[in-house]
Amino acid sequence: MGASIDDYSLVHKNILHSEDLLKYILETSAYPREHEQLKGLREVTEKHEWSSALVPADEGLFLSMLLKLMNAKRTIEIGVYTGYSLLTTALALPEDGKITAIDVNKSFFEIGLPFIQKAGVEHKINFIESEALPVLDQMLQEMKEEDLYDYAFVDADKSNYANYHERLVKLVRIGGAILYDNTLWYGSVAYPEYPGLHPEEEVARLSFRNLNTFLAADPRVEISQVSIGDGVTIXRRLY
């Protein structure tokens, strides 16, 4: 069985806020095209206490399509959780593609590792258990022009997205893409105030309001904010 549309967290997280439309998209377009190992990983993750952090299947297909259109080979992922977006990326990259994946919690990554191994893409992944900022700063010190990344995906601690951006805009090549997940935050970013959120959710909401304004004014990137999942902002590096 696929994800239950009755699962509050799944509907609440999706920007559509429509159970019927979400069900239609998932069952008509997403689940039929979902890789067997992604399906298995999704079903295991849905039982996890933090299942709301799972990247939705329709968003996964979107990421896969973008990676293939870009012909991406070198990518970086900040925030891995159980690895649904990571496995999506690994499947989309060519056989010699490489992913640098950074997360503070390796135990979550190990939930998804058997599915990554069964998919035959473990060799593409370099997992680093660490806070992301020190790793990114070290990369900046050692990076050569030919080592720049084609693509980055960020789905980690929300209050640090702007700090990640300052590093990634130097680590991703000109013409490459930096994607930020959850930037519409349940749709709550549209309002100056949004009563009822838990304190940590409110911190994230305010962080995203600031980030969205910041990215819109950043001349180093052109952006598109996509209403899929909980909102994905694509920033293409210009210089």
From Swiss-Prot:
The keyword RNA-binding does not apply. InterPro entries: Cation-dep_OMT (IPR050362), SAM-dependent_MTases_sf (IPR029063), SAM_O-MeTrfase (IPR002935). S-adenosyl-L-methionine binds at V55, E77, G79, V80, S85, D103, A132, D157. Its EC number is 2.1.1.336. One of its GO terms (biological process) is methylation. The keyword Protein transport does not apply. It is an enzyme of class 2 (transferase). It catalyses: norbelladine + S-adenosyl-L-methionine = 4'-O-methylnorbelladine + S-adenosyl-L-homocysteine + H(+). Pathway: Alkaloid biosynthesis. One of its GO terms (molecular function) is O-methyltransferase activity. A divalent metal cation binds at D155, D181, N182. Gene3D superfamilies: Vaccinia Virus protein VP39 (3.40.50.150). Its cofactor is Mg(2+). Keywords: Alkaloid metabolism, Metal-binding, Methyltransferase, S-adenosyl-L-methionine, Transferase. SUPFAM superfamilies: S-adenosyl-L-methionine-dependent methyltransferases. Belongs to the class I-like SAM-binding methyltransferase superfamily. Cation-dependent O-methyltransferase family. 4'-O-methyltransferase converting norbelladine to 4'-O-methylnorbelladine. 4'-O-methylnorbelladine is a precursor to all Amaryllidaceae alkaloids such as galanthamine, lycorine and haemanthamine, and including haemanthamine- and crinamine-type alkaloids, promising anticancer agents. This is Norbelladine 4'-O-methyltransferase 3. It comes from Narcissus aff. pseudonarcissus MK-2014. The lineage of its organism: Eukaryota, Viridiplantae, Streptophyta, Embryophyta, Tracheophyta. The gene is N4OMT3.
